[in-house]
């Protein structure tokens, strides 16, 4: 399981799932987001041309860092930084791809238009430091506007820098294609990448001509501010950016094209310097008068889900998770979890629910922080939560009934989510979840549902994990039947399953050591992953094959398990009969379509894309809600008068001032109304030894999780939680995952003295990198891509009006004009 908004990289099994069903109040829903009421033509813009004019002698760092932050300055010509969120596959509107169930367990569509929460924290951090920043959700724009011309709209953006997130690996195709277009349209504007996947593939990315900078690590607010300050100063003064070797976590090119990899040394100890109160996106929409480009995902207005993050990092070590303790230690330089102060977490929740009435999900199991943190957080919520609230846990909460009694005593309603991955304890142990047994999980489900304030308990399974066979997957239905019998078919228990797709997480233990965990990789480098994103279906796109079941067996077993679970829920009233019948029909149609696809691919002649074109409409219909209805996971919520009042107050306090600023030529910051301190580096052992070699020997000390974060160590001060499964201090639970931890410790030790690449926290030995499986279908499609590009140019993503030839000619003319100016 991976938290979609937070540490884990891939959105196929994360905490933020579509748990909400918006009540149908058309009149009230009109004011669901006051921003939407004013974000309509002719006021909506794709990128307003504004700039700060510095007062003589003023430093960017001297600008307000907190409070009202209503700093205004004369408008000049452009934004300082624009974050662009690309679709997973850039030209998805032209291609025929059967995405299948890859996004069934998350709120977004298969193009993963939901941008990471980190974009909002970065923008807010920039704004409180005096820079102008905005989010431009290109994927959302492409989904919402059928005729949206990508290149035309990107050409209108005016910014001193562009940033593209590559946090979740499925964006590997779209992010690069958008970067190429931006560099064509704005050849002198630097482009930076960031996110967990960017951190892992920073050397691959910096090799692209269209990328100038790559940031590594999970907390780059301050390093990025340092770079933005240099770039803005250089552009305003007409001087070179200069040497950037003092900016931590940065991979960059100098003016000669030489690549530099700065130390991965910026790793804050806590999450207290960033804003998680949603002030920035709400104020940003009102300021830009542009709602669609800020929209988190398709359907958000009817489904306004929000998240509160407890931490960055993890004390657990699931084998296939790119957000595990192993991944954070070896790829992101983090030796301990960075916790958010529970008081700030409570304030975040209070502030969000003032303006958004959808459910709030608390991500990243806060029980890892220990009992003191847990008690302060839960008790602090008493009387303050009016929205539905859900908690993600990585296992049965210690204390059982006592813990649920505490939830009942402080919250009027609450929900729980746990991803067990498999009903088979042996499979779960191989995955890294041997610290509890399914019998314990069953007990905690019964205990939770016995409490009157428990709204629901969501349980998730996943196919494709280590040592899992097709037979084991098909046994899931029988286990679910047993589980429902035990809770007397309580409809508050919601069970779902989905595949580990499209990718095995890069940076995970299993990705770095595939043979050890029973995998063969179809892709290892960034470019190999990028190429796979245009393949015809989710089973072809996958970057791995398991030794325990073939890809075809996995697809069939996934559909079988989904059919069984759906049938059980339909027969016993857990799911509406009509909805159950619709899901059953769609799963069977999806399976039939996959068989038809195989027939077209392997028995047809001619170009693959031509053969696939006839299937596009059916692919699109069957690539959402494939194995389940998203609405099945929806929690009912109510709109309260206080929501409308707070929205009205937000509009009154911002809209007139923003309009006045536009008329007078000034800029109004969208920074949070709360004061936050500057981000500071952590005091943990550095990621680098004095001689420049990676430091992989750090041992922590025990702490209770308050203030300075939960160190990954046991009572003896030995670093064991970096290999996963120790329980937070204060909770007496046996570590039943010792064998799994020992195996990973052995793998970790085997990395010492290997051919470490400068800049990697701990490099993968060359012997482990190996070669990937040969894929004839991919080879044929890439040959066809090359032939088509040579004769006709690349596919256009400009919508119905975006002919590639015309756009390419226009771009060439613009580029030639810019070059003539330089000469």
PLM regions: where:
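Glycine-rich beta-alpha loop elements in corrinoid/cobalamin-binding modules
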Residues: 118, 125, 134-270, 506
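Catalytic cores of alpha/beta
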Residues: 204-207, 467-482
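Conserved SAM/AdoMet-binding glycine-rich loop
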Residues: 79-84, 163, 192, 341-456, ...
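Flexible glycine/acidic-rich beta-alpha junction loops that bind and position SAM and/or redox cofactors
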Residues: 91-93, 201-202, 316, 328-329, ...
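N-terminal [4Fe-4S]-dependent radical SAM core
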Residues: 76-81, 92-97, 247, 253-310
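Radical SAM enzyme core and accessory elements
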Residues: 5, 9, 70-83, 132, ...
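Short glycine-rich His-centered loop
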Residues: 81-111
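Canonical Radical SAM [4Fe-4S] cluster-binding loop centered on the CxxxCxxC motif
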Residues: 298-341
């Amino acid at each position: 399981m991976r938290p979609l908004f937070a540490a884990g990289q891939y959105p196929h099994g994360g905490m933020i799932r579509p748990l909400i069903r918006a009540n149908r109040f058309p009149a009230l829903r009109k004011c669901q987001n006051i921003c939407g009421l004013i974000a309509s033509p002719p006021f909506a813009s794709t990128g307003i041309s504004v700039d700060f004019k510095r007062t003589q002698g003023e430093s960017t760092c001297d600008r307000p860092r907190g409070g009202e932050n209503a700093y205004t300055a004369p408008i000049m010509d452009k934004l300082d930084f624009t974050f662009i969120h690309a679709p997973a596959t850039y030209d998805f509107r032209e291609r025929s791809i059967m995405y299948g169930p890859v996004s069934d367990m998350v709120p977004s569509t298969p193009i993963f238009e939901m941008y990471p929460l980190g974009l909002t924290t970065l923008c807010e951090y920039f704004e409180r430091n005096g820079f102008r920043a905005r989010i431009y959700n290109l994927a959302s724009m492409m989904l919402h506007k059928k005729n949206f011309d990508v290149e035309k709209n990107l050409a209108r953006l005016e910014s001193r820098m562009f940033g593209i997130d590559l946090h979740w690996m499925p964006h590997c195709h779209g992010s690069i294609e958008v970067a190429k277009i931006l560099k064509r349209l704005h050849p002198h504007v630097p482009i930076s990448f960031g996110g967990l996947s960017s951190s892992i593939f920073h050397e691959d990315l910096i090799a692209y001509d269209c990328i100038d900078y790559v940031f590594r690590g999970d907390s780059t607010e301050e390093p990025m501010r340092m770079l933005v300050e240099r770039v803005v100063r250089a552009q305003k003064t007409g001087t070179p950016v200069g040497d950037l070797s003092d900016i931590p976590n940065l991979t960059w090119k100098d003016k000669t094209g030489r690549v530099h990899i700065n130390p991965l040394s910026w790793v804050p100890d806590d999450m207290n310097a960033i804003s998680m109160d949603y002030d920035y996106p709400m104020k940003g929409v009102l300021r830009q008068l542009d709602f669609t480009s800020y929209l988190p995902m398709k359907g958000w207005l009817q489904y306004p889900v929000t998240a509160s993050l407890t931490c960055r990092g993890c004390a657990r070590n699931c084998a296939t998770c790119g957000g595990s303790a192993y991944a954070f230690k070896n790829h992101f330089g983090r030796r301990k979890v960075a916790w958010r102060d529970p008081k700030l977490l409570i304030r975040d929740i209070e502030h969000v629910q003032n303006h958004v009435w959808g459910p709030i999900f608390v991500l990243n199991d806060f029980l890892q922080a220990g009992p003191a943190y847990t008690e302060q957080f839960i008790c602090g919520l008493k009387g303050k939560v009016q929205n539905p609230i859900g908690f993600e846990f990585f296992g049965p909460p210690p204390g059982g009934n006592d813990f649920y009694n505490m939830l009942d005593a402080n919250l009027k309603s609450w929900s729980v989510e746990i991803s067990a991955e498999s009903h088979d304890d042996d499979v779960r142990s191989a995955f890294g979840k041997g610290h509890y047994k399914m019998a314990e999980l069953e007990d905690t489900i019964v205990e939770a549902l016995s409490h009157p304030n428990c709204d629901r308990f969501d349980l998730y399974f996943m196919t494709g994990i280590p040592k899992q066979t097709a037979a084991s997957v098909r046994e899931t239905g029988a286990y679910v039947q047993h589980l429902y019998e035990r809770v007397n078919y309580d409809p508050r228990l919601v069970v779902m399953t989905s595949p580990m797709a499209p990718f095995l997480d890069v940076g995970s233990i299993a990705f770095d050591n595939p043979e050890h965990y029973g995998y063969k990789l179809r892709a290892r480098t960034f470019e190999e992953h990028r190429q796979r994103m245009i393949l015809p279906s989710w089973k072809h796109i996958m970057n791995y094959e398991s030794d325990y079941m073939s890809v075809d067996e996995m697809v069939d077993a996934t559909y079988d398990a989904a059919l069984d679970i759906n049938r059980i829920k339909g027969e016993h009233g857990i799911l509406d009969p009509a909805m159950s019948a619709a899901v059953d029909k769609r799963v069977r149609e999806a399976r039939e379509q996959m068989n038809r696809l195989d027939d077209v691919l392997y028995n047809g002649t001619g170009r693959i894309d031509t053969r696939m074109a006839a299937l596009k409409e059916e692919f699109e219909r069957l690539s959402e809600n494939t194995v389940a209805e998203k609405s099945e996971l929806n929690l009912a919520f109510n709109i309260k008068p206080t929501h409308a009042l707070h929205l009205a107050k937000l509009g009154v306090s911002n809209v007139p001032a923003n309009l006045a600023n536009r008329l007078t030529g000034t800029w109004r910051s969208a920074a949070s109304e709360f004061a936050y301190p500057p981000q500071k580096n952590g005091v943990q052992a550095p990621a680098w030894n004095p001689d420049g070699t990676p430091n992989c020997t750090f041992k922590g000390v025990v702490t209770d999780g308050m203030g300075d974060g939960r160190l990954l160590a046991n009572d003896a001060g030995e670093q064991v939680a970096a290999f996963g499964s120790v329980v937070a201090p204060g909770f007496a639970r046996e570590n039943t995952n010792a064998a799994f931890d020992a195996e990973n410790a052995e793998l970790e030790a085997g990395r010492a003295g290997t051919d470490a690449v400068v800049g990697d926290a701990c490099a993968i030995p060359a012997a482990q990198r190996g070669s990937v499986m040969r894929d004839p279908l991919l080879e044929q499609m890439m040959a066809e891509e090359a032939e088509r590009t040579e004769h006709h140019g690349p596919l256009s993503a400009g919508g119905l009006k975006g002919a590639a030839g015309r756009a390419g000619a226009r771009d060439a003319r613009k580029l030639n004009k810019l070059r003539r100016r330089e000469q």
